Amino acid sequence: MVILTGRSLTLDDMEAILYKGVKVGLSQSCINEIEASRRAVEKIVQDGRTVYGINTGFGKFSDVQIAAADTEELQRNLILSHACGVGGYFSDEISQAMMVLRANALAKGFSGVRLEVVEMLLELINKDIYPCIPSQGSLGASGDLAPLSHLALVLIGEGEVRYRGECMSTASCFAKLGIQPLTLQAKEGLALINGTQAMTAVGVVAYLEAEKLAYQGEQIAAVTMEGLQGIIDAFDQAVHVARGYQEQIDVAARMRHLLQGSKLTTKQGEKRVQDAYSLRCIPQVHGAVWQALGYVKDKLLIEMNAATDNPLLFDEGEKVISGGNFHGEPIAFAMDFLCIAMAELGNIAERRVERLVNPQLNDLPPFLSPAPGLQSGAMIMQYVAASLVSENKTLAHPASVDSIPSSANQEDHVSMGTIAARHALQIVENVRRICAIEAICALQAVEYRGIAAMAPATKTFFVEARRVVPTITADRVFAKDIEAMAQWLRNGGKAAAVLS
């Protein structure tokens, strides 16, 4: 079980919850802090102090005083009116990640919600009930208002959920399971929707998939090196230590490990003096991707454990401060950086595909075809890879440089962080398919060279990958092969071998 403390949630924890079904609990210290902050809110209400979000309107209506008798209606109206998301629903993993992250933020004790609110989130997580949350509509400040409102709808018995693969009304799901919806009290509606948990949830899923794919990309590149009889000297440790980037040094070391014992790779001068950049510069380019992933990971870890509500309560409610922790700029920048890095991983992989299929660049059969001319082989696979690379270049345009004022210009600068995160996830999906295409072509190339001469590590990859996509002996519908290989990679195909 992962115990939320509001301070110690890790990416490994998120992976365990989202992909392995590990349950979630709450530490006793968090329970104490939640209850203390709630008492502070109730005292504010009792004393009649005017505090934003507790007894005022929202956004441009922040100067409108709300009567105590209207508090519950205020919170309900906030959720209903802000649930304006459009587009397709987020995946179950992202929906669940949003709940985990929101529960963890509320567990810090700065938001003033009742313990029942956090417990309801944990119940949904642990019973695998996934709010149906539209993916479009967030400006990334004040946080992810629209998507988080769709999450909050479920807590009050409204909206829709997915349960056991079926989409249904929240009311019918709760009735089936005997769950009582909440009636939100002072500040709780705002506390649920004012934060960066949508962009961070998408970012977490994008990062986890990107990290796995970065390792797999090295494995596939190693097979390509054998298929093209690449020059191993370029991975010599001395070259990379001379530059000094640790990530580059690490990639070179993994490439040496993967290719150890290969009789297909060559030495410089044996067949040619040097390779093209897409082979020779694997450590430099892939290493730079790892540098970017390190930056993204650091920012996600901070945001996963951040208080992003507004206002925040300090000193047992003596200080209630309106700030801007809901502004998604740090995650927006990180996601834009992830877009760039993963787009580059796709760029260099596609160039290796071109070298595998272009008869002017190798001595393999044209387009790896078993009967060139009569059969086209992998010709159009390279087209698809090029198309995905081009799409990624468009998606990698930074979302964070845009801002459109909202709420009558009260919220006059926004992050567009959720757009950046969605783009990053789409790029990762595209790059996975590019890597799948490289893998299919590399497997075919080494089969022409002779698999007996492969390195032990790459041969292990070959054997397992061939169970997914068989040898190309004649033209067939290769779309099925690409999707099968991409799904295998998504499920973790041979990522562990790169780490050994």
UniProtKB/Swiss-Prot annotation:
HAMAP family per the UniProt record, alphabetical: His_ammonia_lyase
Pathway note: Amino-acid degradation; L-histidine degradation into L-glutamate; N-formimidoyl-L-glutamate from L-histidine: step 1/3
GO cellular component: cytoplasm
Similarity annotation: Belongs to the PAL/histidase family.
Gene: hutH
Major location category of this protein: cytoplasm
Cellular compartments annotated: Cytoplasm
Organism: Shouchella clausii (strain KSM-K16) (Alkalihalobacillus clausii)
Protein name per UniProt: Histidine ammonia-lyase
